[in-house]
């Protein structure tokens, strides 16, 4: 029986939101349109816009909403205002008048890759996004300000697999650090690998690190169990986890075809051997026996070709 894959981010999000336990970890996520863009930029300073179908961080964009206050226009009263001393009863009211005379200006910063663009209105931002979206389904998600390692944002990948007893088991956590100037941490986008301890320990004490590790291991299992209710042939998932500035974990995305070879680059080789053992058991990786039989068959096939040619 083949391993089930689910490519739609929106489909997976809807299923996960049905679990009260898992939903607490999911940032506000909606299907993209003009009205939703307006609402999300009002609610959150950062928002990420990403394709419903996509891998390796391709197509991900970030919108940052920037609020500033314009200076009040100068007038002939400026000299008179300079004569108002701090002790004057008019000083406080004059200061309040200056505040009310200024007005808030909102601009929008759009970033994709290392490129940044600025738009003075929401309509212009939406038009720029539509040109990149090109009619495809995109999602808009509340942006989580990531913890940083050496001034570079990072996130975590939690791997959960079916074990040899056909139960869900979280088998590994690795860290990914974004390349300078990038908004994504994906290795294909120039990010680099790190261990969970290397990234988290500077922000949390040892007891906090262990508590977070246990929480993520449980979250991996809860997430897999919830997804399996709708997709019964799932065998493995990779969860992209953001840690906000307080150390709170958030689920950014769940991948049903997670990369496993990156775990082999980490120091814990025993964990990697277990990951591969489970992947072989449920059919993700070929078994050693199959590899051996294939290799043995190749010389025989070539030998028969030689005989047929000789005839």
Task: Please give the residue ranges for each predicted region.
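Phosphate-binding site of ATP-dependent enzymes
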Residues: 44, 73-193
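Protein kinase-like catalytic core scaffold
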Residues: 47, 169, 250-252
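A long amphipathic alpha-helix within ATP-dependent nucleotide-binding catalytic cores
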Residues: 128-147, 181-242
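A conserved helix-loop-beta module that forms one wall/lid of the active-site cleft
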Residues: 1-66, 92
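C-terminal active-site "lid" helix and adjoining low-complexity regulatory extension at the edge
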Residues: 1-5, 204, 211-214, 218, ...
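Short, low-complexity Ser/Thr-rich regulatory SLiMs
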Residues: 64-65, 160-164, 241-245
């Amino acid at each position: 029986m083949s391993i089930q894959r689910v490519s739609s981010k929106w489909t997976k999000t809807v299923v996960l939101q049905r679990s009260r336990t898992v939903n607490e970890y999911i940032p506000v996520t909606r299907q993209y349109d003009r009205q939703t863009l307006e609402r999300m930029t009002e609610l959150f300073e950062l928002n990420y816009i990403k394709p419903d179908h996509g891998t390796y961080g391709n197509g991900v964009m970030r919108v940052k909403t920037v609020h500033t206050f314009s200076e009040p226009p100068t007038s002939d009263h400026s000299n008179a205002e300079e004569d108002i001393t701090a002790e004057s009863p008019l000083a406080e009211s004059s200061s309040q008048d200056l505040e009310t005379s200024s007005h808030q200006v909102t601009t929008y910063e759009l970033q994709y890759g290392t490129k940044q663009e600025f738009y003075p209105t929401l309509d212009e931002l939406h038009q720029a996004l539509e040109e990149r979206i090109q009619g495809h389904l995109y999602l808009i998600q509340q942006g989580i300000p990531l913890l940083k390692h050496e001034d570079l944002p990072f996130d975590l990948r939690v791997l959960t697999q079916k074990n040899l007893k056909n139960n869900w088991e979280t088998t590994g956590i690795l860290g990914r650090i974004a390349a300078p100037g990038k908004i994504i941490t994906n290795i294909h986008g120039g990010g680099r690998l790190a261990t969970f301890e290397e990234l988290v320990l500077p922000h949390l004490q040892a007891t906090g690190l262990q508590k977070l590790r246990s929480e993520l291991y449980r979250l991996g299992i809860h997430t897999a169990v919830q997804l399996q209710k709708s997709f019964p042939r799932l065998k493995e998932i990779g969860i992209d986890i953001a840690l906000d500035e307080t150390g709170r974990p958030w689920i950014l995305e769940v991948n049903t075809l997670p990369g496993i070879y990156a775990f082999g680059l980490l120091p814990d080789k025993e964990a990697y051997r277990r990951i591969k053992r489970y992947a072989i058991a449920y059919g993700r990786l070929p078994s050693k026996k199959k590899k051996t039989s294939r290799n043995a068959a190749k010389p025989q096939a070539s030998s028969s070709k030689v005989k047929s040619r000789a005839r």
